[in-house]
Amino acid sequence: MSSLAALGPAKSGLISWSENLPPKVRANVDPIRTAIAAADAEGLAREVTAEATRRLSEFVTGIRAYRNHPYRRPPTQARPVWQDGSSRLLDYGGRGRPVLLVPSLINRAEILDLRPGASFCAWLRDNGHRPLLLDWGVPGEAETDFDLGAYIGERLGGALDAATKLAGGPVPMVGYCMGGLLTLAAALAHPGKVAGLALLATPWDFHADQSGQTGMLATAAALPSEPGTPPLPIDLIQALFASLQPNLIQAKFRRFATMDPDAPETEAFVALEDWLNDGVELAAPAARDCLIGWYRDNTPARGAWKVAGQAIDPADLTCPAFVALPTRDRIVPPASAGALATALPDPTVIEPRAGHIGMMIGSRAESALWEPLGTWLKIEC
């Protein structure tokens, strides 16, 4: 439908082309401009309308197929071993050494235990480790005024204490996405409790690749600062991340409309989509820290991010470090995460050929991430 809206201005020459287009794209600009100018206006409008209608119909069909699919995620078999407010530490068992897993604040922790066959937690348990998953939960009354420092100090700090008690000593931590930044701060605050730190698709230089940040910065400017401000709604958070790939939603549901409802990949799609659509609100002070401190002011890369008065400097990390840089990540650009790898002292670095989420739960996740990370945990931690 966006093509239909742009047709008139494009035909009249009112749409200018960006000077920053990649060379391969720019090579097609002149032929497209010439073809539009030469086309019969009414005929072109009919063709564009027909194509837009077809795509919209496929999109709606895909959404209906998704909503009617019978798959439901089975209940987790993990048991809570610690809780504070809305946050819990889930123990997946296993005879190996405890490993503390820390996901992002803005998505459900289930991405690390998505479904049978796509569960990092289950793989760790079955391969000589004892995964402990920090489930941040949904912000409630106790978390209304939590900033990132409160989440790190009170919730992550409490979970780390519980994990070290179970282990009888320091434990390795694995932070995914935003969770990596939080674990880095915790590791610097409690070096004696952390045996190693793995950072998976973790941003650091938020200005290294600013594509898609317009929505983030606009939201940051509109955030109120009064105490007791309600959490940032999940619908707004999802809209911000959807803006990074504006055409992805319609494309994936059009593709889903053509998939066999009984195929394993269809179940995988539904499981992931259920997780994406079941996001978590973000406490307003924490949202300000992220959108203003990180995205607008780039405090981590500038050396200006502080937690409880301590500057968060990766160079100060004393335990072994592991960094995963997925090369096809659209959520955390490789340049942003790569800056963290550069700032750490002698980390082990891998570069899975995957996206932000595919690295963790895709068909090649075991060989691309789980196995090298599991080996590193056993050798270095």
Give the positions of each predicted feature.
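Short beta-strand immediately N-terminal to the catalytic nucleophile in serine-hydrolase-like folds
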Residues: M173-G175, L200, A324
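Gly/Ala-rich beta-loop-alpha elbow adjacent to hydrolase catalytic centers
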Residues: V174-T183
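Short, surface-exposed "cap/lid" segments of acyl-processing enzymes
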Residues: Y66-R67, R72-G140
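Catalytic histidine-centered segment of alpha/beta-hydrolase-like enzymes
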Residues: I331-P334, A354-A368
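Short alpha-helix in the alpha/beta-hydrolase fold that links the catalytic acid
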Residues: C319, P333-T342
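Short beta-strand/loop motif that positions the catalytic acidic residue
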Residues: L317, V323-L325, D329
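Alpha/beta-hydrolase active-site loop
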Residues: D145-K165
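Alpha/beta-hydrolase-fold enzymes
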Residues: M1-A37, G169, L182-P285
